[in-house]
């Protein structure tokens, strides 16, 4: 660190800061990712200072020009932050001083690094929320396409990882659509709390200068300004909320990934993953592995860990600002990039999967998953459900014992369990008839899936 590069807080101290302590406390290797947001916030701040006659218009022009040049230098890599600079704010201010001299010191009038970094973080979050919403929207469009393609393909629905009832594959894909819709809603709701400017709170108690926080909020396209200067700089709940929303989103992706991994296995054989999204084995030449799905499933743990990390960092901190909060950047940045990249690659993966329709047709036509239809058939004949359930259980036991599937049980055999059976039972034991017999709202029938598709398309139009 050259003699010209003084730490921003160093003037009060008679001894230089220990180099090992500086290296330990330096965050520039992480927070350099905020250089655009930092410069954007600084330009808004000095513009407001000039409008409030705290600095001159000429000084403002010099500051803005210098900041724009530094932004280009950082973007191009001609200005490389060093750990001795402590943080990205110091990098920018020191470089500004080299460019325009002592006027650079006026950039911090009425501002602390506390409200500065809080502003940077909110600007960053706003951008990442927009990117993530776009990624989720692309996933939803993909799911609508899959649901349209496979709306009349019958697959097994599962509970406890056991075949439960036949359903439309379109119904399955639209279930994920609904989950990701709530994920988008969480982000949209969070944005209301993120898009509030903390700039003007200073260190935590405000400033004696005639600042205009509403003006900087306007310049930075914030919807509102802080109401309490302590709160503005001392909480990180919006970061925790963002990581929490991402954790839920990654949980959805992880569950979806698990289905793809299982369904693409030889044991299930329901689905084929394109070679472009599968890998092999360095030893076993026959292998085709669902590695992308497995990686998304694994990365979910990273995001969960980031959530616990943030909650632990903030646990028990006294008001207002504490240096512990410097540790918020790594979990935030990692969560944003991991979730966005996972959503994007998983959307592409879904586009490179194909259901094995003929195999599914063969499997669903000869399976015990039609047992519920027998119970509901008896209920439609005015038998109490509990009795219908008991009788159907006996029929299933008989089917397994005789080694025959439910549709192959003769009417005479059915009637040994209940005289209510007639030839109409066989209509219920066809997978397509089973699916289309569902009359309740949001069910798996082809008609219901078509209505759900129309609703999904309408929602996507509204959210554009």
UniProtKB/Swiss-Prot annotation:
Q: Name one Pfam family in it.
A: Lyase_1
Q: What catalytic activity is recorded? A: 2-(N(omega)-L-arginino)succinate = fumarate + L-arginine
Name-wise, this protein is Argininosuccinate lyase
What does the record give under GO molecular function?
A: argininosuccinate lyase activity
Associated pathway:
Amino-acid biosynthesis; L-arginine biosynthesis; L-arginine from L-ornithine and carbamoyl phosphate: step 3/3
- On the tree of life, the source organism's domain of life is Bacteria
What is this organism's lineage?
Bacteria, Pseudomonadati, Chlorobiota, Chlorobiia, Chlorobiales
Principal localisation: cytoplasm
């Amino acid at each position: 660190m050259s003699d010209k590069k003084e730490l921003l807080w160093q003037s009060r101290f008679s001894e230089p800061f220990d180099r090992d302590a500086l290296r330990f406390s330096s965050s520039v290797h992480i927070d350099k990712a905020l250089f655009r947001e930092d410069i954007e916030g600084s330009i808004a701040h000095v513009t407001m200072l000039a409008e409030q006659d705290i600095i001159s218009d000429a000084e403002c022009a010099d500051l803005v020009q210098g900041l724009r040049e530094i932004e280009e230098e950082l973007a191009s890599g001609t200005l490389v932050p060093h750990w001795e600079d402590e943080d990205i704010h110091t990098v920018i201010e020191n470089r500004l001083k080299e460019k325009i001299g002592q006027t650079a010191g006026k950039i911090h009038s009425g501002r602390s690094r506390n409200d500065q970094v809080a502003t940077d973080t909110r600007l960053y979050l706003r951008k990442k929320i927009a990117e993530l919403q776009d990624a989720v929207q692309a996933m939803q469009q993909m799911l609508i396409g899959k649901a349209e393609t496979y709306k009349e393909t019958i697959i097994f629905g599962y509970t406890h990882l056991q075949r439960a009832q036949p359903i439309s594959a379109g119904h399955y894909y639209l279930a994920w659509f609904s989950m990701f819709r709530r994920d988008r809603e969480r982000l949209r709701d969070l944005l209301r709390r993120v898009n509030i400017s903390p700039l003007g709170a200073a260190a935590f108690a405000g400033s004696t200068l005639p600042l205009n926080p509403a003006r900087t909020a306007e310049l930075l396209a914030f919807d509102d300004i802080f109401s309490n200067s302590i709160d503005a700089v001392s909480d990180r709940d919006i970061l925790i909320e963002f990581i929490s929303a991402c954790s839920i989103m990654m949980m959805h992706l992880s569950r979806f990934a698990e289905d793809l991994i299982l369904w693409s296995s030889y044991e299930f054989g329901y689905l084929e993953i394109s070679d472009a999204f599968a890998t092999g084995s360095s030893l076993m030449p026959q292998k085709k592995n669902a590695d992308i799905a497995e990686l998304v499933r694994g990365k979910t743990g990273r995001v969960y860990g980031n959530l616990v990390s943030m909650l632990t960092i903030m646990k028990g901190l006294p008001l207002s600002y504490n240096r512990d909060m410097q540790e918020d950047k790594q979990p935030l940045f990692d969560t944003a990039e991991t979730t966005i990249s996972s959503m994007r690659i998983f959307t592409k993966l879904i586009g490179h999967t194909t259901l094995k329709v003929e195999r599914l047709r063969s499997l669903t036509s000869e399976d015990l998953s039609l047992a519920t239809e027998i119970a509901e058939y008896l209920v439609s004949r005015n038998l109490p459900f509990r009795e219908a359930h008991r009788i159907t259980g006996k029929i299933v036991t008989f089917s397994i014992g005789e080694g025959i599937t439910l549709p192959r049980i003769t009417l005479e055999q059915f009637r040994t369990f209940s005289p209510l059976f007639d030839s109409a039972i066989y209509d219920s034991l066809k997978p397509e008839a089973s699916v289309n017999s569902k009359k309740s709202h949001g069910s798996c029938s082809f008609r219901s899936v078509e209505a759900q598709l129309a609703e999904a398309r309408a929602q996507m139009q509204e959210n554009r």
